[in-house]
A protein has these predicted regions:
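Ligand-binding clefts of soluble mixed alpha/beta catalytic domains
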Residues: 1-456
Length: 456
């Protein structure tokens, strides 16, 4: 149902004689998605090229005001020619008004954006401030600077405004596709999320067997997308930011109808035919840490429980990564540790060093930690540790010392004996244990220290 269809631009020195523009280039309204109330704004590029002026911005702001009152998500569709030059500072003030409304709504109601045309300059901040953003693969273009304005760049060499470039590099795009694909994803996302920060995470009923055996889990550790699909209700896994930092997988699963956010280390990406498409080291990267941190912060804001699948043995060691990794690692550690939502960690493979600690370990606040029988938890690989501790030993002695070290220091049983693992489980039983853990943690309450906010 459309709202504000009679709104038009005010007269200015440069458009006194201009014809009236229907809806001032943006259509706003409210509707239902699977029975859930949502508020929508959609820019109309056929009217004033979809440019943002004073009244255009006020219409979008009014959508946010209504959504905040009703506790309902906001969905925006962008196709914009930029700022309306005729309205000068009034139009700039409109940009600021939209930014402010998005910031005020952050962590209160979900914000979702679809870019179906141009989204350039200051307007690119709008999808970046949203919780989830999508770009239409052929017509959608998102940029701060146009590709031909970037020093040293050529359009034919690198189209930095293209959907594929933005999806792989900027960290705020959750997916690209056709308009129909994007709308379908948005509808699915709305159905999975709480409507607001006080909404219930039980967003669906469950007819899937809660004790269903996941017999192929042990073979899926390399690509957690398959593992998460296997353990979820009806095998549904909704991935976010799928093209960005592929070595860190984020998305949503369902466990007994409860929406759970998932963060997982990934070493292999398989294609639709089950063949290896990409491979990564079991190491944390700056992009991956930032991706995980942002996702965990969103989940915590809406009290969505978080599940981590840990399989990591260190950090990416290259010059580019070293420039950013410490800050990104701190951000991810802060996000996990400060989150008060239910947190469960499942160690599926290796868990070595401070990379393991940062991945939602017991040490930084995980409520429950499970591990598979063949998981390895410790300072580092046992053979490397033996070589460091016994530098003059021959190969046979190194192997013997490594075996002793692994048994005493790096085995899952030794970690469990010290309380760092709550239970060692069989991969086939993963689903039933996770369902039970999150059911138990549903009423979790944390009396956090009083403060304005943290600094990371």
């Amino acid at each position: 149902m459309e709202i504000g269809s009679l709104v038009t631009a005010r007269s200015t020195d440069f458009n006194l004689t201009a014809a009236k523009a229907p809806s001032d280039g943006v259509i706003i309204g409210q509707g239902l998605i699977d029975g859930n109330l949502v508020f929508i704004y959609s820019q109309d590029a056929t009217v004033l090229n979809g440019t943002i002026g004073e009244m255009h911005a006020k219409k979008i702001a009014s959508v946010y005001d209504m959504a905040m009152k009703m506790g309902a998500p906001v969905i925006g569709f962008i196709d914009c020619g930029g700022i309306r030059l005729q309205e000068s500072v009034d139009a700039l003030d409109g940009f600021g008004l939209i930014y402010a409304k998005e910031v005020a709504a952050s962590g209160v109601i979900p914000q979702i954006c679809g870019v179906f045309g141009n989204c350039g300059g200051g307007l690119s901040v709008v999808p970046a401030l949203c919780d989830f953003a999508y770009i239409e693969e052929s017509k959608g273009r998102m940029f701060v600077n146009t590709p031909d304005a970037i020093e040293g760049n050529r359009v034919e060499k690198c189209d930095t405004a293209a959907a594929s470039f933005q999806s792989e590099n900027n960290g705020c795009v959750d997916g690209i596709g056709s308009e129909d694909d994007i709308i379908a994803d948005i509808r699915a996302l709305v159905s999975m999320l709480p409507l607001n920060n006080e909404g219930d995470v039980y967003t669906d009923s469950c007819e899937d067997d809660l004790n269903r055996a996941c017999n192929s889990m042990a073979d899926m550790k390399a690509d957690p997308r398959f593992l998460l699909s296997e353990l979820s209700d009806d095998h549904v896994f909704f991935e976010t930011k799928k093209d960005f930092a592929k070595n860190m997988v984020t998305g949503f699963v369902k466990l007994n109808g409860m929406t759970v956010g998932a963060v997982a280390n990934c070493s292999t990406v398989y294609d639709a035919e089950g063949k290896k498409a990409e491979e990564f080291a079991l190491s944390l990267t700056a992009k991956g840490c930032n991706k995980a941190a942002e996702f965990v912060s969103f989940c915590d804001a809406f009290s969505i429980p978080v599940l981590t699948l840990t399989n990591v043995n260190g950090f990416k060691n290259c010059m580019c990564s070293e420039k950013k990794l410490a800050k990104a690692l701190a951000r991810m550690t802060y996000a996990f540790s400060s989150a008060t939502c239910p947190k469960v960690n499942l160690i599926t493979g290796e868990a070595y060093g401070s990379a393991y600690v940062a991945m939602n370990s017991k040490s930084i606040g995980a409520d429950m930690v499970y591990a598979y029988h063949d998981a390895k938890i410790g300072m580092m690989d046992s053979k490397i540790a033996a070589e460091i501790m016994y530098p003059g030993a021959d190969a046979k002695e190194i192997d013997e010392k490594a075996a002793d070290y692994e048994k005493l220091q790096s085995s899952v049983s030794s970690a469990a004996a010290r309380g760092y693992v709550d239970l060692i489980i069989d991969p086939a039983d993963t689903r039933k244990y996770l369902v039970g853990a999150f059911e138990m943690l549903y009423t979790k309450y944390v009396d956090a220290p009083e403060k304005k906010h943290g600094t990371k």
